[in-house]
Amino acid sequence: MPAIITNKFRIHNSEQFQESFSESSANVYYLAIGRPHAFGTSTRPDSRTEFEGSDTSAPTPVDSIQEEFYSFDDFMAAKKVTSNDISFSVPRRNWTTGTVYDYYRHDYGHLVTGSTSSTQSANSGATALYDATFYVLTSDFNVYKCLDNNGDANSTVEPSGTSNSILTTGDGYKWKYMYSLSAAQRQNFLSTDFMAVATNSTVSSAAVDGAVNIVKIKTAGSGGTNGSHTGVAIRGDGSSGACTVTVSGGAVTAVTVTTPGTGYTYGYIRNADIVSAGATSLSGSELDVIIEPKGGHGFNAVKELGGFFVMCNTNFEGTESSNTGDFVVGQDFRRVALLRDIKSGGSAASSTTLRGTKAILLASNSGNFTVDEEINQATSGAVGKVVEWDSSNKILYYVQTRHNDAGADSNGNLTAFSSTHTITGQSSSSTGTPSSASSTVDSISFSSGYVGSEIDADTGDVLYLENRASITRASDQTENV
């Protein structure tokens, strides 16, 4: 049986995601960064290799169980995402002069019959409203919906102003002002490809449910009496709609709505009514009454423009010193992940930030360890990868992955660092002896010299995963992710 999952279901999902931040049993989300070492071909303990792209061409993540497990191996830190960090969004479409924009229609994709039969499509070829280029972002950061493109003409006059009335520009386009991007929205939710979408309360309050403002000419007809014929009824399930039909050369050349009416979910204009209004002998005209979305244009910008995308923007400020300094600086990252309902120390994570690395407190050392070098421990055979070396506090931060030289030992096992056996850096030749004491140093509580990651491995869900070119972090730097 033919069926479809509608775009409203996609919008519903985005609404549910936003609501999940504030429900009584709210989900908890974190944005994590990871992969401090370069992408490349990795050797597995069974001597086979896995291709992981390169630093010049980051690998495309795979939606798989393996990818989710792998991602937890090298998380460096994570920061909680709040409801202020998210926004409904739509594809960004900048107004550009000389462009033919699509106009809003309620019936894209429907088979329209009459003098000709065809699937209703936009000038761009789109057969679905949300695929059509029917809204724009202007240089003033105002967003407008195109209601009429003047017969597929080039747009040459940028719309401006915030009036609730329909705006007709000098190029014949008709626009409806929807909302403006605030300074905060521009800072946090405006990218090259997407932009925030939100309903303007003033515009929403002024919207009229079921009004008709646009009528398009499908077939102009012939034989009619020239002139402007007023009082032509817009029939349908609404009331009071009326228009003026202009006939020139015997054919319909323009339709101007004079009374928008209310309550229309379908409508039509009969050729006979145009004849009765004075266009004697007109025949064959076919007019399309454009039905507005529920509530009217501007009533709900999120639904009207297709806001089934959600943007997330979280700031990482240096070490996040105000939040216990869990973020590493002087190191780079190549992976970003959105995590849901992870655990920390066996319980639901709740801290503003979480440290993703493991750490060893050294009692003594010789030389300085270097970032990204392999470290090995005598006797235990443990292997790891250095993320940060805090020489002042003698804390060695590291990760362990499931590959050779980064976590797997000579037997292919992931062995934990333990006891006071000497740790050696394979590039720097530095050595260190782990402390056997349990103490708190730099806000980190060590047990016999060791502490695990504050992100419990393989808990919760990875909802989003992105590999990217390396970004080097600095203490005076803020990343907007």
Where does each model-flagged region fall?
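Tryptophan-rich substrate-binding surfaces of secreted polymer-degrading and adhesive proteins
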Residues: 1-207, 286-288, 296, 341-345, ...
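Conserved, function-critical positions that sit in or immediately flank catalytic
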Residues: 171-481
